[in-house]
Structure formats: C-alpha cells, structure tokens
Amino acid sequence: MWRFAVFLAAFFVQDVVGSHGDPELHMTTPQIIERWGYPAMIYTVATDDGYILEMHRIPFGKTNVTWPNGKRPVVFMQHGLLCASSDWVVNLPDQSAGFLFADAGFDVWLGNMRGNTYSMKHKDLKPSHSAFWDWSWDEMATYDLNAMINHVLEVTGQDSVYYMGHSQGTLTMFSHLSKDDGSFAKKIKKFFALAPIGSVKHIKGFLSFFANYFSLEFDGWFDIFGAGEFLPNNWAMKLAAKDICGGLKVEADLCDNVLFLIAGPESDQWNQTRVPVYATHDPAGTSTQNIVHWMQMVHHGGVPAYDWGTKTNKKKYGQANPPEYDFTAIKGTKIYLYWSDADWLADTPDVPDYLLTRLNPAIVAQNNHLPDYNHLDFTWGLRAPDDIYRPAIKLCTDDYLGK
C-alpha cells in the first residue's frame, strides 16, 4: 500500500515536470549506479537484534586514482529520515555525492537502516509481524550503525571510515558516539554531519503539526498512522497538507508526498528533471514507532530515548521517564557541520542553540552555515557538490595522505 501511494505521487509529479519514461523511476540503487557506468556491489549484514541490512558499494570510480598504500580510503554514507541509499546517487554523476567520492578514488559504501526499501528482512520476523516494526532510531543508533560500520571495515581491511550522514543519519551517529567508550569513535576518522539533528523542538512541517496537534500523553498515534510500517491515513495526510502547504507555491501532488511535508517542499536548487526520480525512491519507509519517537522529541525539546510509557520505562530504563542522550559526552571524532536557516527539520534555533552548545568545541572542526538549503538540498541540491562534497573530498584526501 505504501509503495503504491508513492508510485501514484511520483506519477503525478513526473506529469508536472514533463519527464516521462526515465528508467531510474523503476531502478534499484545498484541499478542506478550501473546505469552510469560505475561498478555496484551488494552486501548484507545482520544486527545483534536480528535485522538484515543491505548496503550498496561503489568500489571505485571512472578515474584511475592510486594511493600510496594501495588501499582506497573508505567513505560511508548514511541516509536520513524516510530515505535510502539512493539519495546519494539520484542526481547526475557530477552532482551526486556517491559518484563524486568514487571518482576521487574512494571506496564508497551506502548504508540502509532497518525498515527501509532495502532492509526489510529479519532472521525470525516478517514485515507482516507487528514485532518486526517494534523499534525507532534508538535501535538504529545502537545496532544498525555498529553492524554496518564493522562489516565495512572487515571487508575492506581498513581500521576506520570517513562518515557522511544526513538528517537521521547524523542523529543516530551523535547518539551512538554519546554512549561510546572510545572503541567506536576511533573507527570514524571524520564525521560530516549534513542537516544535523539534535533537538527538533522548533521544527516546521508534518512532524511539528501532529506533535503540537495532540498532547504528549495522546495514545492514539498508532491508530492515526497505522501500526507497523509508517503510512498516514488519508484524512491525516490531507489535514497536514492543508495546514502546511496551503500558503506555499508548490504542486499539490508534490506536497502530498509525506517526505516533502516533513522536510520542506520548496527548493530553488533541484534538477527539476530528476524530481520524479526523487519522489519514486523516497519516502523509502520506516516504522510508525520511529515517527512517534520524532514527535516525542518535539515535545521534549531534547534528545530522549523512546518513551514507552511509565510502566515499561521503569522496566527498560529503571526510571519513569526515558533518559536523554548526552551529546556533551561525545569525544574523539572530528565533526564537520553543514546546516541552514531554511531547513525545516535541522532548523534554527535548534542547531545553534541546542546542538552547538552541547558539542565540545574541540571536536567541531567546522561549522558551515549555508544559505537557502532546505532539508533535502543537502543530498539533492545542485549547490551541494561545491558547498559540501568537493570540500569534504579534499579534507578526506589530505587527511588520508597525511597532509
């Protein structure tokens, strides 16, 4: 049902922009990679709690780049909320982070968190089982990152990776590092945080609308959004779309796509011929529990673990309220921040007033405040290659060469 709804949204969007018949509408991430003449490889890894995650790899690019030690540096890219590995390759090769890093000589790995298009398997559970969806970004931070990064290091023989995360891909890394004893941090040479997430108290859009529409004690979230895989009921979508998009000059069908309702539908830096491809591959799925966790964060104003309710919290956490992730405890990994006032999700004032006040200045290598980036522009925007990807490539290259 969810994929059918996304297909309809993509069909209407492509009618608007006049881009009929793009083969990438029906391709997987590896197929998109191969379409542009790059090698693509697929790997799977099991998490400690049984989920089977699929990763996509571009082992090398079209250029003949050699390294002194004979090993290519590894960059691991982690998608954001409701997204997938495709985010890093859905623009043209000279516009997509995955291809640009590959052509610069990097071994590129693209992760997929549990519950998205590519990570829908479990050792014992099926997606039709409600227990399959009993998780939020807590478990992604605890299990998924560990499993994927460790597998990448095992396959490549490297002892560390360069990490580029977007949106939820930054939240999970921040959260994992905040509980790390130092053993994981040493595996992350540099952390490029695109649209970084700490507090989301002041966000706009879909999540803010529903979080503020109902009280924190409201217990009908799963009735509204459906149990298991996240799919808002039609009335809920229409209610949110009317409130959020009523005053914006956007195509109705584009606004009906829940991803744009969450992240912000207006952008002046998308390749418009690619919009149907964006809308076909995203949203890529997550659990309703994960969406509820995000809305709990809106109410909380910080970064709490999932709130199961007082009784279960006491069993799970040993206290009535969920504990908060302590970002002041992060150490050992250099972080490069990229954020914008125009972002609905990694917004102002949450980034400067919450995230930056908690990260130790000693680990914040760069704080890049970019003008006019919405939440999705960090992966799809046409200015991102010059503003983010190429500078990041140079930083990683110089670091790997010991400059």
Curated annotation (Swiss-Prot):
Its EC number is 3.1.1.-. Disruption phenotype: RNAi-mediated knockdown impairs triglyceride catabolism and further increases lifespan extension in response to bacteria (nutrient) deprivation. It is found in: Lysosome lumen; Secreted. Glycans are attached at N64, N271. Lipase involved in lipid homeostasis. Does not affect global triglyceride levels in response to nutrient availability. However, in coelomocytes, specifically promotes triglyceride catabolism and lifespan extension in response to nutrient deprivation. Belongs to the AB hydrolase superfamily. Lipase family. This is Lipase lipl-5. It comes from Caenorhabditis elegans.
